[in-house]
Amino acid sequence: MLSWAITFLIIAIVAAVLGFGGIAGAATGIAKILFIIFLVLFVASFFFGRGRG
């Protein structure tokens, strides 16, 4: 999931440099959403995984 967020972030940066505003905005939005999902899953797995150890 983190790789998808990084991929969309790179697409957004390249699109912004080349001047494709709509594509850059969409890719940035997707990257932000994926990053937030990844962060929530990471924190949840960290806290729930501590009880097993």
UniProtKB/Swiss-Prot annotation:
Q: Locate the transmembrane regions by residue number.
A: 4-24, 29-49
Keyword annotations for this protein, in alphabetical order, are: Cell membrane, Membrane, Transmembrane, Transmembrane helix
Q: Where in the cell is it found?
A: Cell membrane
Repeat as a keyword?
Answer: no
Q: Name one GO cellular component term.
A: plasma membrane
Which Pfam family would be a valid example here? DUF1328
Q: Which residues form a coiled coil?
A: none
Which superkingdom, per the lineage? Answer: Bacteria
Q: Which family does it belong to?
A: Belongs to the UPF0391 family.
Protein name (Swiss-Prot/TrEMBL)? UPF0391 membrane protein PSEEN0090
Q: Which organism is it from?
A: Pseudomonas entomophila (strain L48)
